[in-house]
Amino acid sequence: MHQKLVAVDWGTSSLRGALINSDGAVLEKRAFPQGIMQVAHGQFQNVFEQRFADWMTDDMLCLVSGMAGSRQGWREAPYCPCPSGFEDIAQHLQWIEKDRIGIVPGLSTFNDATPDVMRGEEIQIFGALNTLKIETAQLVLPGTHSKWAKVLNSKITDFKTFMTGEFYALLSQHSILAKTCLPDAPLKKEVFLEGVMQSQKPGGLLHHAFSARSLALFEKLNPAQSSSYISGLLIGEEIKSAKSSMQSDSTPLFILGNSQLTQRYAFAMDALELSAQALADEVTWSGLWALAHHLYPDHFKLS
């Protein structure tokens, strides 16, 4: 019988783990700058044992989400097609050791015949549903590659990816805009919202992005402000594009992620008259524990 869960989130640049007891309480957490890109081929088992062997007693279950299931990871866990819920993910777990160490698969969907994928975000989404005790929602997960997901009856039915964070890095550090931008400057809310509102006007992102350059040339933006303006342009463009495929206004909208990013999205949505609730709490551990409950309901009991 499994007494506890070792929950692991193994991403591109970081490795995190949590020791969780059978009723869902987190007992201990660990984090290392040892993502899959820092692990040599064939060394995943060794790294896992170095970091978590003391947790892995005979009565433990371990579930690993994130990029560990990619082709460059520990073992590939093929994508589950949407719609997918816990039952679908459970059926497609890749077991390193049967009933002991399992790799969680990501999800795939098609938008206008074009594939889209996620790895790790699906666990955050299910964690949010478990935390909120809801079955239907739409969720935004800001990041390097932001996700907008739809959930109906506890199944992720569809999602879209936006390269917002990556475009911010490219524009603010590797384009002509970098000459007049401090990419790590603190958020200037008023200037950020100017960028958000500018993004809603005709012309499109390729046109509006150059306004960050021209405003700087005419001394309407200084380098510390320019980063907020560019961020507002990009997040505003993302929201404008995503709004067209959102579910009805009555379906609750949640923002998942670190507080700095969720704050920006909350500011932008408020300015655009979209109602959304930001969730600052850690939901990955809740999602992996909920999956463990689905797999072994007699071992991991809902409170």
Annotate each language-model stretch with its function.
Residues 5-43:
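Short glycine-rich, Thr/Ser-proximal phosphate-binding strand/loop in the N-terminal lobe
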